[in-house]
């Protein structure tokens, strides 16, 4: 069977940066370490006044196509995953195609376009759709452009405000991919949950503490479901484990449970038993509560062991390096985590060709998905072509007052667009260019 997977990746960050420890924490009267240590975040990315989900997605896709020497004829579908859409009918992919048609000679009239919604897991679902389309043989030799783009804003004063972010990840899904081949095996954990939702409103209704528990519960189901088709997972199976990363502290919790689950009945559990005992087993307890308490105590000790720390530092921590600087990108977050881990490997001269990644996506509402990916021989060139460090370094750092201004500019209920002043000059990129006759958003390319 021909390999199908991710052939190219581009990351586009919002051009503004809010420093959480230096700027946000003092304004909120918080200890900076709540952000840097507790949540694991240093900064958030925000879109400048002329940026939005369309410009970030189109700019990422444009760079990807230019770099790969592609024309619209090479693209058979454009799927956008977002939970920040501004139109309940016309998909964001049409706006992005419209942007790209301004800079390419050909059009995308032949391309199937759509928009995927299931909170943050929709980016992974769009990759799935592209994978299935290619596997079904309906692609006529073409590739799919998958764009995960979000402006993750919370109402001011919401606890989620600390985890905001904005950016897009564009991915090319093709036969014989250069970056990773996707496994056929997948695991799902999906349930009707009300942890985080936006019932026809821009800013989410969030039960933050519960959302953390729902993430863990659905992820646990997805891991078990994956094991039911792919076999029992051992912690050494995966060289990197990119998770959906609303904030790195969330991944720290998920990773501890993943490690605990995958060392059970292995030589690692036996080796650790000398120091911290074996994992509690439910049959040894009279009540669920006593079992859960004992598991909690075991986990607290487990994460302090050298074995766990070594595993975490090698397999999980590298996937969090970009996220720490940009915050939550919702649909793009797990794809940023994958890119971050690969970038770390490249910078540390690791030979990853043939290595296996375990990719764990999550979307509120709620669904987790787990699959494996095999790193392909072209990964180094692809990851070396990313300019994400340059983009991060060039961000304009906003004061708290400027943050409040830009938050208002992007608030759909506030009429600030007319006088919205940008903090950075646009150059060589698509920009928001006002409103059209039917309430549509308009875009133009700035040389
Ligand atoms: N030094 C070190 N650590 C500190 C600290 C300090 N001074 N002060 C606090 N901390 C730690 C806390 O102990 C806590 O860590 P633990 O959870 O490990 O105990 C962490 O920092 C955060 O502190 P709080 O729990 O007090 O923070 P909070 O209540 O203000 O907000 C939150 C946390 C509820 C997750 C909030 O950020 C939120 O609502 N976020 C949005 C929802 C979200 O991202 N949920 C994640 C799962 S859902 C999902 O993944 C989908 C999605 O993308 C939204």
Where are these regions (language model features)?
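Condensing-enzyme catalytic core mediating Claisen C-C bond formation in acyl metabolism
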Residues: 1-51, 160-224, 369-447
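Acidic, glycine-rich active-site loops and adjacent beta-strand->loop/helix elements
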Residues: 10-13, 81-87, 117-122, 147-153, ...
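Conserved catalytic cysteine-centered active-site region
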Residues: 32-51, 85-143, 149, 154, ...
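Phosphate/pyrophosphate-binding loops at sites that engage ATP/ADP/AMP, CoA/4′-phosphopantetheine
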Residues: 60-76, 220-239, 256-260, 278, ...
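A short, small-residue-rich loop immediately preceding and capping a beta-strand
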Residues: 76-79, 140-150, 355-361
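Flexible glycine/proline-enriched surface loops and loop-helix/loop-strand junctions
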Residues: 153-155, 199-208, 235, 318-320
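Long, repeat-rich segments with strong aromatic
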Residues: 236-254
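Catalytic phosphate/nucleotide-handling subdomain of diverse soluble enzymes
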Residues: 339-392
